[in-house]
Amino acid sequence: MRLKKGLMISAIALTGVLALSACTNSAETAPEATVEEDVTFEAGTRMAELNEAGEITIGTKFDQPLFGLVGPDNKPVGFDVEIGKLIAAKLGISADNINWTETVSTNREPFIQSGEVDLVIATYTINDKRKEVVSFAGPYYEAGQDILVLEGNPENIEGPEDLEGVNVCSVSGSTSEANLAEYGAVVLPAAGYSDCLEPLRSGQVSAISTDNVILAGLADQNEGFEVVNNPFTEEPYGIGLALEDDEFRSWINDVLTESYEDGDWEAAWEGTAGKVLDLPEPPAVDNYARP
């Protein structure tokens, strides 16, 4: 993780109070990706196996507004979900044949390693430690860790330097939790970020800290909170997959790059997170060599 004080990311700019249902209602998400017909892949590749199976299992968050949140129809919606649909469509797999599995910060690597999921697209920060056990395509978005406080910011928390000795809620096993320790915060671990809201309301903690896009979704959905808007890390979101499958990773990177150029990535954003956040520049994918 690269700590960078003062980093500003355009995607954090909120555009007013919008109903979260407007951006998570499945009827108002991005247009469905066009499923490739008669697509063929080299025999023995993971792409060929998935295409032949006609289905794919993708792990994503079920409780994160804007990126991955289960809707009234019990299906996840959000930007991560749309990225998953784009990849599936290029494999010749329709959205109806995606098996969505809930992943949280503590089980993403185990789910990939065990084969329980084919991919993880779940606000999943790429870092060197994780690269030791799983591989990453992307990044497809870059966030930054920020801070959520009560509306009006009664404790005048302006940045991470103000968190020393302060009770802060974050998710157990996340990069956000580790970053907070570097600033001397007293971390109250939670299973999910929605579980942090009541401790903040009640005064058990003074702040919640994680990626700005996650906090923006929470603030948009729940009254009485605001984002400090002072991101202090770089969080490149990647698509997790099996460690040694370089061919699949390279293919996904090509799909992402194509989506930047043909407008599919932008449509996925505007139909989900773009209901609340400004359109960012897509990051260049990183075709890194495995250690």
Task: Give, region by region, the residue ranges found by the protein language model.
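Bacterial lipoprotein signal-peptidase II cleavage site
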Residues: 20-32
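Extracytoplasmic small-molecule ligand-binding "clamshell" domains
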Residues: 33-119
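Bilobed "Venus flytrap"/periplasmic-binding protein-like clamshell domains
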Residues: 65, 76-91, 125, 143-197, ...
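A ligand-binding cleft/hinge motif common to bilobed small-molecule-binding domains
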Residues: 107, 123-132, 182, 201-202, ...
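Short helix-initiation/N-cap motifs at beta->coil->alpha
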Residues: 98-110, 155, 172-173, 188-198, ...
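Acidic, polar ligand-binding/catalytic clefts
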Residues: 98-162
